Amino acid sequence: MEQELRSIPASKLDQFIEVHLPDISFRDELREVIDVLCILLKNRCCRESSHPVRTSKVGKGGSSRKGTTLKGWSDADLVVFLDSFTCFGDQLNRRGEFTKEIKKLLFEVQRDRHIGVKIEVHSSWSPNHRALSFKLSAPDQQKEVKFDVLPAYDLLGHVCIPRKPNPQFYANLISERTSLGKEDEFSTCFTELQLYFLNWRPTKLKSLIRLVKHWYQLCKEKLGDPLPPQYALELLTIYAWERGGRLTKFNTAQGFRTVLELITKYKQLLIYWTVCYDFQHPEVSKYLRRQLKKPRPVILDPANPTGNIAGSNPKGWRRLAGEAAAWLRYPCFKYKDGFPVCPWDVPTEVDIPSQNYFFHIICLIFWLLLRLIFGKHSV
């Protein structure tokens, strides 16, 4: 598969992507099973535990929900939001007991012969794991979907998406994350926002993300771990498209090359968005500025400012950057006449707004003038 991708000319990349779309029949079958699982998780999950609780909602994430699946391979997240989790600490300390209940429910579904796909729950799971993993596969087809089921604190409640969340949500997250000493443990709480961030993007961009993910899987097969998380490359692709012009129709090879060139410049990456949070709230602003001063690469989760998706994994980035540099010489980045594809002009960092010292200086001058004026009258 690697030989096939790197050998085709740049003009054929769109056709290559079409070949690697999931089959419609399996996708429809998968959607039906996911809907059944969501209903079961919503109505029956944790009702028979020692302390029965209500599931407020079930969020769907992963590539199967984002529309960026690969043929024969996909991943999905089912986030079970529980009413009994009233803070981040509850999610951290009590998720094990509820994940056991979820596992029991999945075993019941596994025994149901009316479901047209095979469910395989990973036996190596332990209560300390953040998620329960299982696989769905079609017996008559070489296709599977990897799932993670995660119990979570319903932080956002019934926030109307795409409305920007109340910044106090993030202030509370930052405060509790700091007191618990846990880095990026609560990204599951923001699944719906993460999904919205990608879902409204044009189809062509999702196809480019699919191509980048396919390339990443080839690298993983060749290099093994450690590598940067796949989500970091998805965000990097969105960033490249945004800074490259936000076109609904574009040259796929140019977009692909831009992403790989950004990977080779990983030591310079400083990327964040202000779609869900920004610098207006003083506590959030202070925390954001600290996050953005961390050693690069920095790619903040657009839904969760505590999550640096680029992570502290310089070795993984170095290995992936080496592979990206090698790929830039391959035919998939050349036109039929041999001329190389030019990347988009995309900066490696997003500017950080300066703190409003000027306003404070004006206030100070105004205060001094008032003292001088009223001081003279008082003499």
From Swiss-Prot:
Membrane topology (Extracellular): 375-379
Compartment(s) where it occurs, according to its Swiss-Prot or TrEMBL record: Endoplasmic reticulum membrane
Classification via InterPro entries: 2-5-oligoAdlate_synth_1_dom2/C, NT_2-5OAS_ClassI-CCAase, NT_sf, Polymerase_NTP_transf_dom
Pfam families registered for this protein in UniProt: NTP_transf_2, OAS1_C
Predominant location category: endoplasmic reticulum
Cross-referenced PROSITE patterns: 25A_SYNTH_3 (PS50152)
SUPFAM superfamilies, sorted: Nucleotidyltransferase (SSF81301), PAP/OAS1 substrate-binding domain (SSF81631)
Expression sites by tissue: Highly expressed in the brain, liver, spleen and heart.
Keywords from the UniProt entry: Antiviral defense, Endoplasmic reticulum, Immunity, Innate immunity, Membrane, RNA-binding, Transmembrane, Transmembrane helix
GO BP annotations listed: antiviral innate immune response; interleukin-27-mediated signaling pathway; negative regulation of viral genome replication; response to virus; type I interferon-mediated signaling pathway
GO MF annotation list: double-stranded RNA binding; nucleotidyltransferase activity
Cytoplasmic membrane side: 1-355
Listed GO CC annotations: cytosol; endoplasmic reticulum membrane; membrane; nucleoplasm
Membrane-spanning parts: 356-374
Membrane topology classification: Single-pass type IV membrane protein
Subunit field text: Interacts with OSBPL1A and ABCF3.
Family in the record: Belongs to the 2-5A synthase family.
Function: Does not have 2'-5'-OAS activity, but can bind double-stranded RNA. Displays antiviral activity against viruses via an alternative antiviral pathway independent of RNase L.
Protein's name according to its UniProt entry: Inactive 2'-5'-oligoadenylate synthase 1B
Organism of this sequence: Rattus norvegicus
